[in-house]
């Protein structure tokens, strides 16, 4: 190779064989490439004209632009290829997932030291192995587990949430099994799931007691409803008895004796019957005196029977707190308000079962010495005299159930039964005898003095009073309210023509005029005051004059009497005699004496008719 050729080769970027240390074959190939490069350079020099420099620069720019475009396109193709690869992998995973064999489920019965478990699945009890990912020691009896196609436990689930409802009869001695009663009184032994067993072994300070209804778990007791899987033979959960919850209202009422007006004598009677035995148990034991088991409050409607029962529970709780040295604000007592008519059920035996559950709950809450009052409102609706049923004979079994609960073999301690009724003559005599409902208190209609006391509970000094009425009594608000009450009571109880209501004719020919006052009640007095307050509000809106006036109360009395003119339209004569309380004769004829009534108001009373409001 000449010196000039070596120089050209260096300019082309090639090295000589001696410089590179190549083999003879590589050197020959390199020499061939040099010749080709020289020939191409010569062709290029021959082809380039005068404007070759400008054209070459333009071609370079075009090539660079094309290279950039191809590079961007290549990047997009790479991204598309990557996304397609990811989608392909996802589809492959989905195909693999869809192609997996189905998994089965079972209920864990027991676990063993060799990491095997007993599982109930597909109606069979089987011993299976567990996946290495499963902590066998963490599995709990009754828990749901997932099995693969090889019947290996691969996942631990929760406890079963659906099943049949059975009633707990008793827990067996081992503490892990229970006797339950299902449909058609079918008895069976079931295992208790881990949550139920753990509650049974909790310390007493971590378990809700009979007197507490908080969120803490409580131990099982006979009568509880359990969620049971009859096939697996497991009870998983305690289900609250909603049917009894709807019938029973557990609370400490906020009504005190000071909220009740016109019933001083009746309040004293019921306090002697209910509070003394609880507050002075030692004296009762010293005199061998048995506390009463029940109290009957009877009388016309709207006169405060339910109010007295609530006040008894409130007062009893506070007095017991004082005796124990507890805070009166945290006093505990229970007032089980039984909605009488809702106890009735079309299925035979259901009403009796509800009564048993109610008294069972009362005994549980009274076991810690906390007073419990079981209040039956409208007692005549469910405990009527046996044999008097027209369309059914349900009372023939309901009444004996109550009798056995009150004074049966299993006695009641710290439980008082209070019944309220405005048809005491319909209650079975066996319930009213001494030893059951010992104390019978009549809640009478208020007289003028009692009416003033009741008005004072609703007309208080905090109410806004009209300036004109205040000025009449020298601006003394207390005197103004007192005068209002006296005037409205005098108007309500005055034996004037405007207050005449009915003329009653008895079977012996005697006649008696009955006034609206003979049908007055605490509820009517409250309605009169509420109506007067409404008139005062309308007066503010219409005339701008603020405050309650005596005239508002007097107008309310007139309107209240007018609304009651047509109410006693179909009434049994014997009931009318009992309401009036003056004659024992049977009523054969009544005549309304309300001003403006036509002669059509005169009517004879049929002895077989429905009952009016006032009974």
UniProtKB/Swiss-Prot annotation:
Disordered as annotated region, ranges: 1-32
Molecular function as annotated in GO: ATP binding; ATP hydrolysis activity
Q: Looking at the record's lineage, which domain of life comes first?
A: Bacteria
Q: Which GO terms describe its biological process?
A: modification-dependent protein catabolic process; proteasomal protein catabolic process
Q: Which PROSITE patterns match?
A: AAA
Residue span of region Docks into pockets in the proteasome alpha-ring: 614-615
Q: Pfam families attached here?
A: AAA, Prot_ATP_ID_OB_C, Prot_ATP_ID_OB_N
SMART domains the UniProt entry points to: AAA
Q: Cellular component terms, GO, for this chain's entry?
A: proteasome complex
Keyword Nucleotide-binding present in the record's keywords: the answer is yes
Q: Describe which pathway this protein belongs to, using the record's wording.
A: Protein degradation; proteasomal Pup-dependent pathway
- Function, in words: ATPase which is responsible for recognizing, binding, unfolding and translocation of pupylated proteins into the bacterial 20S proteasome core particle. May be essential for opening the gate of the 20S proteasome via an interaction with its C-terminus, thereby allowing substrate entry and access to the site of proteolysis. Thus, the C-termini of the proteasomal ATPase may function like a 'key in a lock' to induce gate opening and therefore regulate proteolysis.
Give the HAMAP family listed for this entry: ARC_ATPase
- By what name is this protein known? Proteasome-associated ATPase
């Amino acid at each position: 190779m000449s010196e000039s050729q070596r120089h050209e080769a260096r300019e082309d970027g090639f090295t000589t064989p001696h410089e590179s240390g190549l083999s003879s074959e590589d050197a020959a190939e390199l020499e061939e490439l040099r010749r080709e490069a020289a020939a191409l350079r010569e062709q290029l020099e021959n082809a380039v004209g005068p404007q070759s420099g400008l054209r070459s620069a333009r071609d370079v720019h075009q090539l660079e632009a094309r290279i950039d475009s191809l590079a961007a396109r290549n990047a997009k193709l790479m991204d598309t290829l990557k996304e397609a690869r990811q989608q392909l992998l996802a589809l492959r995973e989905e195909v693999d997932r869809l192609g997996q064999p189905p998994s089965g489920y079972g209920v864990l019965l027991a676990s063993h030291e060799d990491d095997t478990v007993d599982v109930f699945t597909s109606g069979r009890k089987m011993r299976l192995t567990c996946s290495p990912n499963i902590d066998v020691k963490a599995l709990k009896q009754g828990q749901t587990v997932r099995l693969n196609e090889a019947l290996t436990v691969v996942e631990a689930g929760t406890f079963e949430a659906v099943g049949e409802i059975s009633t707990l009869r008793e827990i067996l001695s081992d503490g892990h099994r229970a006797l339950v009663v299902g449909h058609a009184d079918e008895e069976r032994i079931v295992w208790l799931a881990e949550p139920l067993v753990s509650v049974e072994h909790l310390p007493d300070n971590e378990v809700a007691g009979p007197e507490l209804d908080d969120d803490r778990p409580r131990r099982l007791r006979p009568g509880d409803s359990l969620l049971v899987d009859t096939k697996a033979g497991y009870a998983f959960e305690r289900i609250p008895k909603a049917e009894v919850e709807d019938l029973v209202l557990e609370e400490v009422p906020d009504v005190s004796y000071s909220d009740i007006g016109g019933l001083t004598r009746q309040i004293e009677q019921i306090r002697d019957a209910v509070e003394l035995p609880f507050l002075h148990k030692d004296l009762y034991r010293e005199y061998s005196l048995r506390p009463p088991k029940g109290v009957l409050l009877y009388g016309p409607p709207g006169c405060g029977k339910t109010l007295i029962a609530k006040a008894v529970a409130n007062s009893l709780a506070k007095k017991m707190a004082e005796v124990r040295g507890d805070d009166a604000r945290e006093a505990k007592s229970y007032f089980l308000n039984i909605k009488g008519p809702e106890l009735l059920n079309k299925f035979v035996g259901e009403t009796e079962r509800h009564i048993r559950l109610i008294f069972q709950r009362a005994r549980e809450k009274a076991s810690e010495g906390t007073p419990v009052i079981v209040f039956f409102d409208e007692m005549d609706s469910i405990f009527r005299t046996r044999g008097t049923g027209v369309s059914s004979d349900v009372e023939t079994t309901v009444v004996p159930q109550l009798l056995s609960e009150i004074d049966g073999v299993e006695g009641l301690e710290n439980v008082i039964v209070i019944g309220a009724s405005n048809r005491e003559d319909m209650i079975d005599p066996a319930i009213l005898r001494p030893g059951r409902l010992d104390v019978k208190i009549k809640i009478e209609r208020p007289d003028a003095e009692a009416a003033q006391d009741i008005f004072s509970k609703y007309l208080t000094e905090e109410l806004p009073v009209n300036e004109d009425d205040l000025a009449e009594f020298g601006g003394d608000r207390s005197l103004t309210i007192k005068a209002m009450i006296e005037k409205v009571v005098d108007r309500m109880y005055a034996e004037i023509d405007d207050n005449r209501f009915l003329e009653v004719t008895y079977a012996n020919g005697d006649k008696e005029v009955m006034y609206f006052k003979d049908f007055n009640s605490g509820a009517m007095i409250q309605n009169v005051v509420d109506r007067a307050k409404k008139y005062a509000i309308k007066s503010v809106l219409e005339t701008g004059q603020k405050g309650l006036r005596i005239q508002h109360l007097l107008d309310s009395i007139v309107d209240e009497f007018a609304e009651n003119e047509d109410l006693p339209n179909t009434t049994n004569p014997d009931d009318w005699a009992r309401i009036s309380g003056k004659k024992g004769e049977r009523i054969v004829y009544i005549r309304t004496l309300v001003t403006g009534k036509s002669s059509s108001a005169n009517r004879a009373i049929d002895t077989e008719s429905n009952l009016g409001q006032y009974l």
